């Protein structure tokens, strides 16, 4: 499971980049989507790597961002009661986050759960939004370090 966070805006960008971000449901800066580890998704992520930060997310971080930023239809917060009443297999956010991290379930297994997480800008800010993570910036592939970025954006 990959977490993809839009870091840069789309003003003066090519149409194919805008279309790919739209297919990933990334319409605004600091929005996050969780995508499965498939060749199709990785191809889309690589295409927009200069506008997003992405990496493998773990179960603890998934649990944190689902508890703090998970929303259902009507903009109500995601709760254990909502998951228990709308899912026959999961009884809490913790169980659902662990299943998501293992790849055993998807976000659409919970009806009414919004697929985009609207995150806060990172505490202490981005390093720079014009360089890759390897060069000391905030763009591109983070690997497991995406968990620290998501924790700052909780």
From Swiss-Prot:
One of its GO terms (biological process) is translation. Part of the 50S ribosomal subunit. Pfam families: Ribosomal_L30. One of its GO terms (cellular component) is cytosolic large ribosomal subunit. The gene is rpl30. Gene3D superfamilies: 1.10.15.30, Ribosomal protein L30, ferredoxin-like fold domain. The keyword Membrane does not apply. InterPro entries: Ribo_uL30_ferredoxin-like_sf, Ribosomal_uL30, Ribosomal_uL30_arc, Ribosomal_uL30_CS, Ribosomal_uL30_euk_arc, Ribosomal_uL30_ferredoxin-like. Keywords: Ribonucleoprotein, Ribosomal protein. PANTHER family: 60S RIBOSOMAL PROTEIN L7, LARGE RIBOSOMAL SUBUNIT PROTEIN UL30. This is Large ribosomal subunit protein uL30.
